[in-house]
């Protein structure tokens, strides 16, 4: 078996985010890392939308990111610390839309190791040096400079190592143009290591150490070190030089402290706490991330606590000495991994879990209503300030980037009966959790819908003048009339446009600079800007049946297949070409390309005929109306559309930006198939045809504009958009009802929209999320979803949600009541009334937990519930709240042989579980019956068990339960489940159970898979085979009777198969005792599984499923990851394909090595050598290589670049999208 890995949706969780002017213009961009992916985002200052410019797989783990700019430069570079053992500096090239590696310096081994630098990066604010540090011992400093040609240079590394030292954070100190300085939070563990009593470990203090790079001596010295009172978790650089006082802010538990060397005394301020918080009062509070905003006159910091509250931190200075720290509550947003304040007044927030946000900073929080806290205010030691959280006041949400991270569980099924299966994804953490339904398709925003007086058959938009940015008219054609609507604040009918209203229209367009042309069955109407009208009438009884128009040309087909060609002369007159062309058959459809910039005409006309052919005809004056090429089609054509796509940005001599792309002829057939063919711009030859089936109706094609480039809207029984995005072609269905006709639409509110008709309505639509694979509907949940099952009869989902360190609703209400009573009791006689009012206000206050976070209850506190939900409407049908400290870990739906036709839901629950060191107060299996037509859970009984039931699976009319490390069979009883059989030989903890026939496959938490046979006659469960590697399994999936796919905690997927000679029926030994006892526990079972597939995904996989994703497609193995990625592994069907992709992968490894310097082969073999899997992500980077590199690689494979691209596209569309 050989598999090919395709990513359908890249990871959506963000681990790092930095901002800067990476493209060298004034506009600020954001670079984010999503684990093994680098992405460049550009927030649009006008619309507030975040656009993705570039996404690149780096085939390595991005551990740290920093932006820097050389002194006096205008462009920011990106420094990346990764697991490659190399420091890499990247530059973004807007013309190629690529990151280019400028420097790559090797300093250590690959992998995420303790003493290999890469975990921490710090840059001198003036861009003169960069420090890269490991978590322990090693720190290296590189000097950055320019050479004579103004190119960036990098020095050899200077060491700043210190043995036996742990590093917590590193920043560059802003010292102006003095010698560059770096500040580190360190801890020396040498004494603690050598002291057996443990006293030294208890007394170890963290130190703040300053390292100075002496540029004159080319040497790093430890300038100064100071022990800290509190344990710090991160540092913030304070602007220095002419901008501020320099120094650092140390964020530690409950305090923020300003330090600088010299005479500066330490200034420290407690971190304010929420008033009347339900959290454990003993729990400290820390800042988790921060952002700095600096202008010429002032600077401030936004720092966020672990509850999500943001404080604005400012420093008061007196003669360059800092005198106080001031803090003011700013707003509360979900906890972030990184925040970026942009110069345009936006705040970009990459959330730890869930969606990412872009906020507009509406106010700087300078009003006096909000109390300001200061380090100068007198407080007792250990006391702090209190504030009242409130909804957003200073920030305004302007855009949201959907993120599935973390995906806890996923199932693929067609529960909505839509032909194409949907992905039901349980994702998120705590109160921000959601159940999302993903459908393949582009999300459509409906801008406007209006009724029309009848059923129109076509719609167009035209501009008044070629220079106009927006459209002026919408023309709607009916069977016997034409309606003209003007576009303004509202859409209104106009009568003086010059269009003939008493006839249907075949086509209309802007002609030349400012004239309009209307083609109708009896002639052509040329409307000049001063409303003069020229008309050309059809000769005799003939009528126009088809036409094609662009800015300068009109071609019409008369009855009988006669073509007449018109072209505009320099004076703006429309002239008929002297000859006419008789076609051999009736014309069904025609298309002209847009006139290329700087040219007189479009050279080619495409004509589709009844005889199942499409012909390319020249419009060049030298051979006008001469046939150039022809293509036979499998069915009759319905429509044609010539577009220029896949362009690269180029600047001409005048500095005008334009795109140079390829001409494609799109052919829509009557049998619902779309063909895309390359049209040679010189000879007019047709080559490299790609085919896709779109739907059951004939395909109509319309040219629209998307992101400044031409795209094609194809309409069949479903509408599809074909567009080029990040150097790849996408053909994506629209998640919208069937449309009949469309045209591009540009107005002030909607610059790249679509106007379309559906029955008797006119709709204006916008497609904003280009590049998105899925559109999603989200339903909120209360706690972190763990697992869910589908009720087969009603298609409802039974979902278990469990949170650690959380209170149940009942406990929260009880705690609130208790705190309110304490408030009243603590007040004196005269303040009783006021205290009672405050207590009542506190009880009524309801801050949504999805924004403000849930209270942290402390370790060993659990909250859990079972939810019955309708996945289509998203309404909760039934909800069972479990008691405080009961945690649901497994769920199954089954029928019992002795339980009739009823469906039962079994939920495995642990009581008083402590995670570390692991201990359990006991477990239960709750049994519910599904009643009320499938929308109610009726509690039957609970069965006590001695450990956590982490896995439950139905088995031959009974259930298999993994209780701790015991595998048991239970049957349904009146008062509880009855134990029937048990196996004690699983080493650690049963985490999953799969059954097929008499076989049971059990996954252990750290010892991979065990194959178990149930012997009915002896009532025994016997382990007869296991795996040779100790895998830490997270999820597994049956592929066939002998084959299992599984994924582990470290991001690997493997497929293991029992060898053909494996016997699970121990024939020679009728009692089965030999298999039970004839084995040492250390060597496991007597038979071993073979490894067929090993592959490192790079993200922890939490769900695997064998399924088909498209109607009529082949089966693939679909996986989802903790970071929000979705991918598939697809089998090769022929040796020839496998051989081709194996060679392509080999060439890509050498020709296009990964960005961060990690070796691709060793990345995919991180824990186990990669076996029998080809990396489609690497192969698909072929499309984004330089054309000459593409040519050399494809020549090595004895093919042309279009053939290689076609192979890549074909294998993708055969299984997915």
UniProtKB/Swiss-Prot annotation:
Pfam families: Beta-prop_RSE1_1st, Beta-prop_RSE1_2nd, CPSF_A. Its main location: nucleus. One of its GO terms (molecular function) is U2 snRNA binding. It is found in: Nucleus. InterPro entries: Beta-prop_RSE1/DDB1/CPSF1_1st, Cleavage/polyA-sp_fac_asu_C, RSE1/DDB1/CFT1/CPSF1, WD40/YVTN_repeat-like_dom_sf, WD40_repeat_dom_sf. It comes from the Eukaryota. Keywords: mRNA processing, mRNA splicing, Nucleus, Spliceosome. One of its GO terms (biological process) is mRNA splicing, via spliceosome. One of its GO terms (cellular component) is U2 snRNP. Belongs to the RSE1 family. The core of the protein consists of three beta-propeller domains. Component of the 17S U2 SnRNP complex of the spliceosome, a large ribonucleoprotein complex that removes introns from transcribed pre-mRNAs. The 17S U2 SnRNP complex (1) directly participates in early spliceosome assembly and (2) mediates recognition of the intron branch site during pre-mRNA splicing by promoting the selection of the pre-mRNA branch-site adenosine, the nucleophile for the first step of splicing. Component of the 17S U2 SnRNP complex, a ribonucleoprotein complex that contains small nuclear RNA (snRNA) U2 and a number of specific proteins. Part of the SF3B subcomplex of the 17S U2 SnRNP complex. SF3B associates with the splicing subcomplex SF3A and a 12S RNA unit to form the U2 small nuclear ribonucleoproteins complex (U2 snRNP). Component of the minor (U12-type spliceosome) spliceosome. This is Splicing factor 3B subunit 3.
